[in-house]
């Protein structure tokens, strides 16, 4: 019974959410689109001609924004384990980038195996156990950072969802050693009660392999 009540509460909040309503009116696939739009307005990451990788992309809200801003000269590659409906200007790869086949598919889709920007709005399925949920969230952020190190051109950027808690400061310290600038943003479309923030890491210094 408690689970049903919780689901009804979530559904009511979702339906009445002004960002959800706005996304439906303006044709975006999710309320998350507005988070990336705000971040891009502040940092100017999505420029025409850029190559963008979107991790955990389904249902496609971030890929949709990215494709509209990098224009026809750019490229957006969306990866997710889940099925994602096609989007104009987006190459969708249903795969796990932790596995060799998924990583190979991504690299094959990238010009010269390199990207200008890596996006990650990935979040774990919430169990309700805060310690476990935080550990899973930070593990996803670590994976996004590792992937970014592998594919970003020198000077590239990374935007990744983080949650304040265990592992946050360690992740930030690592990112600051790899990028010239790392800032934390909480877009207006993020729920006020959520610990969710986004790290915006710019001007990648380059991996040792470069």
Please provide the spans of the model-predicted regions:
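Class I SAM-dependent methyltransferase Rossmann-like catalytic core
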Residues: 1-48
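Conserved class I S-adenosyl-L-methionine
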Residues: 48-58
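Conserved SAM-binding loop of SAM-dependent methyltransferases across substrates and taxa
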Residues: 59-72
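A short glycine-rich, Lys/Arg-flanked "PGG" loop and its adjoining helix->strand segment in the class I
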Residues: 67, 138-154
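Short glycine-dipeptide loop
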Residues: 72-74, 152-157
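S-adenosyl-L-methionine
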Residues: 79-127
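Glycine/threonine-rich flexible loop motifs
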Residues: 126-137
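Class I S-adenosyl-L-methionine
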Residues: 165-210
